[in-house]
Design a protein with these regions (language model features):
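Aromatic- and Gly/Pro-enriched helix-to-coil junctions and flexible linker segments
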Residues: 1-125
């Protein structure tokens, strides 16, 4: 499993798809209605904290988890905008399938998974 994670993490770099990230604030972006609902939900700040705590070690422009060179699938979760852009993936992979974090390396708690599920389900109609 770990070897698969390593291969997936460096694949974007091998393809040459890693781009320099430009800082963009939420006020500069036209969010769709679903993203706006997610942003304005009462749980958003807690979800952001969970993602920063449990996902950033791998899903960063410069991952700091040992052996991860590039964010898996080039999914970077460093800003609120990143979280909104990848909300569905976060929901499916952490709250529904429990595929992330792999082997629960970041010790994501059940209540954190439930909060992510609640945040997404309540605000996506």
């Amino acid at each position: 499993l770990f070897i698969i994670i390593i291969i997936l993490s460096i694949y974007p770099a091998l393809k040459g798809t890693i781009n320099d990230r430009k800082e963009v604030s939420l006020s500069e972006v036209n969010l769709n209605s679903r993203q706006t609902e997610l942003l304005n939900s009462k749980d958003f700040e807690e979800v952001v904290e969970i993602v920063y705590t449990r996902c950033n070690m791998c899903h960063a422009a410069e991952p700091y988890y040992d052996g991860i060179i590039v964010a898996p699938k080039n999914v970077i979760l460093e800003t609120e905008l990143d979280i909104l852009m990848h909300a569905r993936q976060i929901y499916i992979n952490s709250a529904i399938s429990h595929a992330m974090p792999p082997a629960n390396l970041a010790s994501m708690e059940t209540n954190e998974r439930l909060l992510i599920a609640q945040w997404y389900q309540k605000n996506i109609r």
